[in-house]
Swiss-Prot record:
Subunit field text: Homodimer.
Organism listed in the record: Nitrosospira multiformis (strain ATCC 25196 / NCIMB 11849 / C 71)
InterPro entries: AB_hydrolase_1, AB_hydrolase_fold, HAT_MetX-like
Record's keyword terms, sorted: Acyltransferase, Amino-acid biosynthesis, Cytoplasm, Methionine biosynthesis, Transferase
Protein name (database record): Homoserine O-succinyltransferase
SUPFAM superfamilies: alpha/beta-Hydrolases
Length: 377
């Protein structure tokens, strides 16, 4: 739980919930037991009506805000959005962040020990879907004694989870914040994910996903996957403004080492990611993205998919997000309106591309604050 005063956070401590009831996954696989790492922020009120679940994106985790005692630079990934007096105010709401099943930040995943073998699951960890994650999040809510969330929120893949909540458990969520998301990936996005996976799988150190027993990690492949992904998260405008065609050493080297500043930046980001993230988890997360398509069981009719949804919605997109473009958000809005649901929508001018949902933008944060201020607890 996160300790806080009236002005700022102090420190946060992750917690672990263990579940021994078998989990039946969409793939048909079964996990006999599993653990979820989570963090909480603020105080749950007496009516237990002020809980907000925040779902993370591909490379995110349970650490939404605040710091860890042993790392003064460990601010959570949505620290600019969550906190006392911030857009999602922890003086009003009780927030929960959870590392999704299959993750690599403490929840059961490929790097965890399979008690049946005494070894890491590795490639034997089952493929998981957004629907599976929502099932585990419901169990966590039950574990915490929360019957209904005031809101479920998330950006990108996190926004997809918020959508799935309104479909699978409409009676358990009053508001959904769907930010920089889509109701399904385009063929182009699936292609990006496959190239990233192939970079990992073809790394000689991948060893069919069992690199743990070889004492190595597929660093080169994971690095390339992150470099590719990072390009798609940025906009051309933001890359031009930040890097342009600047040369690292001021002159052409006429070789194949790093010359341009953008090359240096991408390699740094790739190396950093490869040292912090598990390759098998990356494969799982991208597959969950690929498989998300709530309209598919309804003859590709997204409006029909939302037939039983009850929540109120805030849907936000960003002008330069070409990975999950504003048109993808507008398609969600149209489907919600077809079902006469309450929807607030805004397309926010931003130069930061898909990563805009993580940025501290005054207009964006004011929109979220205005919406959350009207959420009754």
């Amino acid at each position: 739980m996160l300790m806080q005063d009236s002005n700022s956070f102090s420190t946060v401590t992750p917690q672990v919930a263990r579940f021994d009831t078998p989990l039946h996954l969409k793939s048909g696989a079964v996990l006999d037991s599993y653990e979820l790492v989570y963090e909480t922020y603020g105080e749950l009120n007496a009516a237990r009506s002020n809980a907000v679940l925040v779902c993370h994106a591909l490379s995110g985790n349970h650490h939404l805000a605040g710091l860890y005692d042993d790392n003064p630079k460990s601010a959570g990934w949505w620290n600019n959005m969550i906190g006392p007096g911030k857009s999602i105010d922890t003086q009003k709401f009780f927030l929960i962040g959870v590392n999704n099943l299959g993750g690599c930040h403490g929840s059961t995943g490929p790097a965890s020990i399979d008690v049946r073998t005494g070894k890491c699951y590795g490639p034997n960890f089952p493929v998981v879907t957004v629907e599976d994650w929502v099932q585990t999040q419901v169990r966590l809510a039950d574990y915490l004694g929360i019957d209904q969330f005031a809101a479920v929120a998330g950006g990108s893949l996190g926004g997809m989870q918020a959508l799935q909540w309104t479909l699978d458990f409409p009676e358990r969520v009053r508001h959904a914040l769907v930010i920089a998301a889509a109701a399904k990936l385009t063929a182009q996005n699936i292609a990006f994910n496959d190239v990233a996976r192939q970079a990992i799988i073809t790394d000689p150190d991948f060893h069919g996903g069992d690199y743990y027993s070889h004492g190595v990690i597929p660093r080169r492949g994971l690095r390339l996957a992150r470099m590719l992904g990072h390009i798609t998260y940025l906009s051309d405008d933001s890359m031009a403004a930040k890097f342009g065609r600047e040369l690292r050493n001021g002159a052409l080297a006429f070789g194949y080492d790093v010359e341009f500043e953008i090359e240096s930046y991408l390699r740094y980001q790739g190396d950093k990611f490869a040292s912090q993230f598990d390759a098998n988890t990356y494969l799982l997360m991208t597959k969950a993205l690929d498989y998300f398509d709530p309209a598919f069981p309804h003859n590709n009719d997204l409006s029909a998919a939302f037939r039983f949804a009850r929540a109120n919605f805030l849907v936000l997109s960003f002008t330069t997000d070409w990975r999950f473009s504003p048109e993808r958000s507008r398609a969600i809005v149209r489907a919600l309106l077809d079902n006469e649901l309450n929807v607030s929508y805004a397309e926010i001018t931003s130069s930061h591309g898909h990563d805009s949902f993580l940025m501290e933008d005054r207009h964006y944060h004011r929109l979220v604050r205005a919406y959350m201020d009207n959420v009754v607890v």
